[in-house]
Design a protein with these regions (language model features):
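Transmembrane-cytosolic junction motif
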Residues: 1-26
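P-loop NTPase motor domains
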Residues: 8, 19, 28, 32, ...
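Conserved ATP-driven motor cores of ASCE-family P-loop NTPases powering translocation/secretion/packaging/pilus
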Residues: 306, 312-315, 320-422
Length: 467
């Protein structure tokens, strides 16, 4: 009898639990990480182009297979986070494709050598659909492609050199030499002749810089002079690219310090061009700047621009792996202030699975709380020393995050959470299917034909015919 009691009671209670009908007013419960993945309903693969519309931005399908749209015509600053391999580049490609179709000048910065495997191909395909010019710039290639200083005013050259070479005072002994370097930056700005390259400036004035105790400035310019790609006597004019609606894919380098400096200076130059646009009467054309692996693009001018540049028609799409990346800043910046600025000025956020607790907890808290039921039960012990659960239960109201920590740590690949578009929504992102082409990564030297030939920039695009 004791044996039967110990055997039957546990199994009978399991049967009761399975067959008991829950109360109609019972709320959701707290999650269990061991079975939370079963709650993610599988969304079949789909073609994102079927869901593109002209006045909204498509952000994937929800758990019911319905499209998620951001309803404003102009996209806000957008932040994308997630571990490597979970789909950041897929979402970047999705948003870049839509920006190109919406006739936005689109500039992609990618610190991976040679560029991403698929993103350039998606952007190239989009330019074919929209019939807009496409340019692939590879900073590492020994081909002159662009003149960084072409078309700049004296003040812009001075500011670009100061920001790019981080010559601001920092309150230490080296400020003495930084002041000397800033003086040489002013000299370069005032003596610049249109068409001069950084290499020509370095070769012409190197001796003068060193005589004026600016050896550090001279050495820095010598390093930049070695980067052939930005020392073209002609080439692509960034101002014309922005004014005429083009697409530029900039493949950089995450290892070589001088290439990282060039990437930051190119971004600073774009910010300068957009900042001087007049919005008194006409609304400036939209410019979309995509920064993949944000930590390689962080600079003081970017941090400041993020706060004010939308008024001039520029919106950023930032991608990085965790919130800790935002504190990996150059010496002339405050890490916490920059991280706070990114979080505050990117109202749209999309995060894939987090692999560190800090990122997972941040976005879980960001999703808000919902009311759930917390159940407690009473147990009695029988004469056979078997625990028996009594039928009476107590339920109390408590809270948990809408997207809790367990969900953030177990999101399937290709699935993320969109914040800033109403209540946080789980979204499935599928890639735009394209074929790899050599043209997507073909570098054009400055001797190439005009960038505006054979482009029908005034043609309207019919979104319904896509896909």
């Amino acid at each position: 009898s004791v044996y039967m009691d110990r055997l039957l009671i546990p199994n009978f209670e399991k049967l009761l639990k399975i067959s008991t009908q829950k109360a109609g007013t019972q709320r959701d419960l707290k999650t269990d990480i061991r079975d939370v993945q079963d709650k993610f309903k599988e969304v079949l693969e789909y073609d994102p182009q079927r869901f593109f519309v002209s006045n909204k931005w498509f952000f994937g399908l929800d758990t019911k297979g319905m499209p998620i749209y951001f309803g404003m015509k102009n996209l806000l600053h957008t932040q994308i986070t997630g571990a490597s391999g979970f789909g950041k580049s897929v979402l970047l490609a999705l948003l870049a494709f839509q920006a190109i179709l919406k006739r936005e000048t689109t500039i992609i910065f990618d610190p991976k050598q040679g560029g991403d495997e698929w993103l350039p191909n998606v952007c190239h395909k989009a330019t074919q659909v929209a019939n807009t010019p496409y340019f692939f710039i590879d900073i590492r290639v020994k081909t002159a492609q662009i003149n960084l200083l072409e078309g700049m005013s004296t003040d812009q050259i001075i500011n670009l050199l100061i920001v790019g070479l981080m010559l601001e005072d920092r309150g230490d002994a080296a400020d003495y030499y930084r002041a000397k370097s800033r003086k040489m930056a002013r000299f370069v700005g005032k003596n610049y002749q249109n068409g001069m390259t950084l290499k020509e400036i370095s070769e012409t004035y190197d001796e003068y810089f060193r005589k004026n105790e600016a050896d550090g400035f001279a050495d820095a310019l010598q390093e930049l002079a070695e980067v052939v790609s930005i020392n073209a006597s002609g080439g692509i004019l960034l101002k014309d690219v922005i004014d005429q609606i083009c697409v530029i894919y900039v493949a950089g380098d995450w290892e070589d310090p001088k290439h990282i400096i060039i990437q930051r200076m190119l971004l600073a130059r774009i910010v300068q061009i957009v900042s001087e646009r007049d919005n008194t009467v006409d609304t400036p054309k939209q410019v979309c700047v995509i920064l993949d692996e944000l930590s390689f693009q962080i600079s003081k001018i970017f941090g400041d621009a993020l706060k004010v540049i939308r008024d001039k028609g520029l919106h950023f799409i930032l991608a990085h792996q965790s919130v800790k990346d935002l504190t990996n800043v150059p010496d002339n910046m405050d890490a916490q202030a920059f991280a706070g600025s990114v979080m505050a000025n990117c109202p749209l956020k999309f995060t894939y699975r987090a692999v560190d607790n800090e990122t997972a907890q941040y976005f879980s808290d960001f999703s808000g709380t919902v009311l759930v039921d917390d159940e407690s039960r009473s147990i009695e012990q029988t004469l056979s020393l078997t625990d028996r659960i009594l039928p009476e239960k107590q339920i109390r109201q408590t809270e948990r995050n809408l997207i809790d920590l367990n969900m953030m740590l177990t999101l399937p690949p290709g699935t993320g959470v969109l914040f800033g578009n109403g209540i946080a929504q789980i979204s499935k992102i599928c890639p735009i299917q394209v074929k790899k082409t050599a043209e997507a990564k073909t570098v054009k030297g400055f001797e190439q034909p005009s960038i505006y030939e054979n482009s029908e920039l005034s043609a309207s695009l019919v979104f319904e015919k896509l896909g």
